[in-house]
From Swiss-Prot:
Pfam families: ATP-synt_ab (PF00006), ATP-synt_ab_N (PF02874), ATP-synt_VA_C (PF22919). Belongs to the ATPase alpha/beta chains family. This is ATP synthase subunit beta. It comes from Streptococcus agalactiae serotype V (strain ATCC BAA-611 / 2603 V/R). F-type ATPases have 2 components, CF(1) - the catalytic core - and CF(0) - the membrane proton channel. CF(1) has five subunits: alpha(3), beta(3), gamma(1), delta(1), epsilon(1). CF(0) has three main subunits: a(1), b(2) and c(9-12). The alpha and beta chains form an alternating ring which encloses part of the gamma chain. CF(1) is attached to CF(0) by a central stalk formed by the gamma and epsilon chains, while a peripheral stalk is formed by the delta and b chains.
Amino acid sequence: MSSGKIAQVVGPVVDVVFASGDKLPEINNALIVYKNGDKSQKVVLEVALELGDGLVRTIAMESTDGLTRGLEVLDTGRAISVPVGKDTLGRVFNVLGDAIDLEEPFAEDAERQPIHKKAPSFDELSTSSEILETGIKVIDLLAPYLKGGKVGLFGGAGVGKTVLIQELIHNIAQEHGGISVFTGVGERTREGNDLYWEMKESGVIEKTAMVFGQMNEPPGARMRVALTGLTIAEYFRDVEGQDVLLFIDNIFRFTQAGSEVSALLGRMPSAVGYQPTLATEMGQLQERITSTKKGSVTSIQAIYVPADDYTDPAPATAFAHLDSTTNLERKLTQMGIYPAVDPLASSSRALTPEIVGDEHYEVATEVQRVLQRYRELQDIIAILGMDELSDEEKTLVGRARRIQFFLSQNFNVAETFTGQPGSYVPVEETVRGFKEILDGKHDQIPEDAFRMVGGIEDVIAKAEKMNY
């Protein structure tokens, strides 16, 4: 194990000099330095650049407070490695794979894997396009998720991103026996803590590994924590042959962290001050999220859009990798429609006859057409009232409102708050229900019977209770 000495500390960037003749650490190797020689105060550095004359530039994964020039630095000879396997489920980790949930620390001999890996090769990739059934009607019908696909989850504060994430984790665990990995990138510590306890109460945590690089941590940790979560997910895909769900919140903060260290590493800034390596860094992360012949990693990524500017390089670079988008709309929460997924703004590459089948595709496009026409008629209704519409338009509005309410449903993870049992609706049942509404089979049932229910049978049962 070769050793060097700290030559310079500039915020999260630390220069380390190695004696001439010593073997220099490789790029992405982990180095260890102890503050004041105290073994309990370890700081991990990751090699980013080799500057020549035995000098390497590194990024700190922890605070550099207390580091001084001249401190000894040890080369571990390998990249940052994190625990993998079934023992990670139900646990919370930081970027280095250290357990931070106050439970038993991981054994020293636990299996670990490096966070830096190559993306699967072409011959390992799965060529089939298979839908991942979520049991959530609005997603399965209008913006279905592909196994091994990437989903962008857009939404402001308080519109239900967290509950939607929890329900997806619950449904994958209950219906598919699947594993989920939640990665908080630049998360507020309070939000991460709330999510952990909510998931513990709902029983979802047993099928979930959680990794956090909080907002108060150095940019090095926030930049690498997504790779830590992805490494845990990849193990379940490649070794256990599982279909894994990987949540990243927020992918923008991954880019932001890279931008923070880029200038300190001596790189010229690119457009809007972002790092010139933005597309490469994003590609290295996103290309590892895919389906192989053994299993799949499906990622759901929350994406913050700065100043609602979709041309900003950070979200624009992420968009290039997405297969589906799920847009949450505040107006729908005000109408009491949950999940508040906008059926017209959300989209999916999987919504084609070749992947979902002809019937599903036709029903989905007709639902979108009816909702779009209803949106166009709303101005007329608001100004002149329903009486000014033709009989055909009145029928369309009635069906559109029933569709809008039928896109809502109770969630299993929200049962403790709502007092209503959650529902998991298979895709076939979802398609059949909406087809019957479009065909006018339920025009006589009151609109309220369609609100917050599961399948179409639940609507009929609810209507009978209402004595329509």
